[in-house]
Amino acid sequence: MDKRILFTLALGAMSQVFAHAWEPKGDKIKTVWAEQVTPENVWQSYPRPQLQRAEWINLNGLWKYAVTDQNTSRKNVSFEGEILVPFAIESSLSGVQKTFLPTDKLWYQREFTLDPSWKNKSTVLHFGAVDYECQVWVNNRLVGTHKGGNNPFSFDITKYLKKNGPQSIEVAVTDPTDTESISRGKQQLNQEGIWYTPVSGIWQTVWLEAVNKTYIRQVLPSTDIRSE
């Protein structure tokens, strides 16, 4: 077969994977608010009102995703479609609604471009929450890891950024759910009775912030009622 035909067929097959527009999967729980969600308007509010900054980029929206076994390396990952962040892969609004097993690994990837005004500032990458354990790469360099499905975390990614052009983020996630003794609420692989569907992967807002070289990272109020 002509090489040009093979290339055309391969390109057509790849385009079909990402050609389908995002839409919710299933119809188990649908509220009036869920019906209004789109990749363009998903969770646009600043995620940390206690310490709000003017210069920030919301990374919620469509990311590429793939589910592999845990032995699959990054270089062998083939992305199979798009997932709407920040919804867990098991959820309807993710657009995927797949069962995620403790032996699986969930991969995310997306690109972003920084505003030129951020050039002389530090850039911090924030995750509201990722369930349960994850690794994060920026421009193919490992930035860090995090373990725990309910708490926010962040990385200063300044030294990993390119001087210009698109930047790439990749996240790999594993979730033992009820196969290990971890904080998981009522999540269980076998949903029955009082148990409910697991929540795996990115399930809170992901965002970038431009900060000065010296900046306030956290505020911890301390009160003393006796002094009043």
Give names to the regions the model predicted.
Residues 223-228:
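Short, solvent-exposed loop/linker segments at the N-terminal edge
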